[in-house]
Curated annotation (Swiss-Prot):
GO CC annotations on file: membrane; periciliary membrane compartment
Record SMART domains: Solute_trans_a
Entry membrane topology: Multi-pass membrane protein
Cytoplasmic compartment segments: 60-70, 115-165, 224-240, 295-384
Lineage per the UniProt record: Eukaryota, Metazoa, Ecdysozoa, Nematoda, Chromadorea
Family annotation (PANTHER family): ORGANIC SOLUTE TRANSPORTER-RELATED (PTHR23423)
Gene source species: Caenorhabditis elegans
One Pfam family it belongs to: Solute_trans_a
InterPro entries the UniProt entry points to: Ostalpha/TMEM184C
Name this polypeptide is given: Organic solute transporter alpha-like protein 1
Amino acid sequence: MEIVKTIIPHNRSYIEPPIPSATEWLANMSVMHVSCLTIACVFVAITFLSSFFHLFFVLKYVSNERIRNDMYALIFMFPITTFASLVGMFIPRAAIFLYAVSLVYFMFTLFIMVTLLFNIFGGRQEMSAYLLQRNIRVNFTVPPLCFFKFLPTVESTDQNLRRIEWLVFQTPIIRTLLELVSVVVSMEQEGRRESVWFVFSQLMALLSMCIAFYGCYVMVPLGREKHAPYRFDFLFRTCDIAQCIYTIQKFVFEFAAAVGLITSDRYLPAAAKALWWASFMCTWEMMLLSALCSYCLRPAKCKFFDLYPGNDMPALSARDGSNSRVPSFSRRLSIEYEPRIAGVMLEPPSRSSLSITPRDKIEDPTTVSYFADNFDSLSQIQGQ
C-alpha cells in the first residue's frame, strides 16, 4: 500500500479512521460481510479436506522419503494461505501481518520446487551429471529476460546449479528479515505505517521475489524430458500462478483504494477494506487451484506416486529411451547414468559396464579404437 500511495497522487491531509479491533468488527459487521465470512469458512474447510486427502496419498504411495518431505510443504501451501486470509478477515488489524506470513511461505515453496526438481534426478549432482551427459546447457534467456538474446549459456555443472538455487533461496530469508524489521518499526510508530522504511522494504521484497522467479524459470526447463512424467511443469505453474494471484491481486485492490474506487465506510477504512476483499478472493481461488491439483496430479497419471497400483506411467530408459514400467526410487540401477569424462563415455556405448572386466577393457580392440577416435577431442578439452 505504501508503494501505491507514493506513486498515486492523493490527499495527504486526509487521515483514515483507525482499523477496528476484532471485537468491534465482529459486533458491527453488515449482513454482506457475515455472508462472505461464512462462504469463506466453507472454502477454507474444503481446502483443508483436500489437503488431508493429498497427504494420505503422498504418505501411502510415494516411496522416496526426500520427495515426500518436499511434497509435505507443497501440500500445506493452500491451507496455510487460505487460513491466514480467513483469520485476517476476522481480525482486520492482523491482516497485513498474516498476508506477509503467507507471502513468506509462498517464497519458501519456490525453494521447495527447486529441491523437488533435484530429488527427481536423485540430487543436484545427479542432475548435473544427467545434463552434462546430454550436453544440456543452462539458458538465461527466459522471462522476464526472454528478449536478451545476447545472454550466454553456461554448462550445467553442480556449482552453476547451486548458484541458481541460491537465487531462489535468498527470497524467504530476505522477506523474513524485512518483515521482522517492519514489525519493529510498526510497533515503534504505534501501529502506523508512515515511515519511509515500509516503501523501501516493499521495493526490496519485490526485487527479491523477481530474482527468485527468474531463478525458477531458468531451472525448470532443464531436463524436461526427465521430469515430464512427474508433471513437474504443471506443479510449478500452479505454484507460480498462486503466488502471482496472491501478490498482484492485493496490489490491484490497494490501487483501487488509492484512486478512490474503494472508499472508507463506517465499518472499515479504505486500505483495510481493500485487503479484506483481497483475502476473501484468495479463499476461493486457492480452493479451485487445490481441486485442480487433485485432478491433474492424480496418482494414476503422475510418476511421483510410484507405489500406486494403477500407476502405469512409462519411464524413459537412460540409454535407449524405451518405455518400461516405472521403477521405485529405491530400486534404481546404478547404470542409469553413463560414466563419462569431459563428455566422452569411458566405454563403448554398445557394451554394458556390468559385463566388462578390467582385462576386457585393456584387450578389447573395440575399446582401444573407441578411445583412439576420441583422443583428439579429450586433448582439446584439456587444453582449454
